[in-house]
Amino acid sequence: MKENKSLQEWLGYAEQIQEDANKIILGQEKAIKLIVISLLARGHVLLEGGVGVGKTTLLQVITKLIGGEYERVEGTVDLMPNDIIYHASINAEGKPNISKGPLLKKGEDLSVFFFNEINRARPQVHSLLLRAMTEKSISAFNKDIYLPNMVVFADRNQVEKNETFELPAAARDRFMMEISIETPKDKALRDSIIFNSRFQDTSKLVKDIPIAN
């Protein structure tokens, strides 16, 4: 996203993203509008909605339209804070290998970071993420790595209550919006999503979007 735009240009830019996204993601006009607002305001978002309503695809589409990079991490009870910063492994020669994790992999190009089922991760992971959200940086590899364009989207597992760690009110206050993603009520839209072959391969759907300038 270019920074040197007039207010009118930003408005046109936002409207164009919404228009393009609505051609790809059906029945989510309100959610798309709110997500675009949050991205332009650099405000983090809690997403509400069941499994399979298309949250991942929606965020991938929006990321492609605005330009920048997308990363996702899955919340589990085994996830540790370091897991989202770096990966440690042993290479073929038996030597340790350290690589950047999902939060740092794309560096300053990271636009959208999706934390799926955040309430399944431990509070220590929440603390690290909330600090990165506030400071827009992470200290790792003996230096500060800045994430100036990162907007965090997170959703919660609202079905399983075992081994979940709900966000306290103070943590939820770090999110600018809570946006509901629901299955479209219009039967024609639902039929199109289910039966139109264009929407069956979501990876191709996202890949075919032209890269934003």
Model-flagged regions — what are they?
Residues 8-53:
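Pre-Walker A (pre-P-loop) alpha-helix and adjacent loop at the N terminus of AAA/AAA+ ATPase modules
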Residues 27, 47, 84, 129, ...:
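Residue-level signature of catalytic and energy-coupling elements of molecular machines
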Residues 33, 40-42, 66, 107-109, ...:
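Short loop/turn elements that form and flank the Walker-type P-loop nucleotide-binding site
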Residues 34-37, 91-114:
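Conserved alpha-helical scaffold flanking the Walker A/P-loop in AAA+ ATPase domains
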Residues 36-77, 89:
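Walker A/P-loop
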Residues 47, 114-115:
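Hydrophobic anchor at the beta1->P-loop junction of P-loop NTPases
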Residues 79-95:
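Conserved NTP-binding/hydrolysis module of P-loop NTPases
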Residues 91-94, 117-128, 133-213:
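Canonical AAA+ ATPase core
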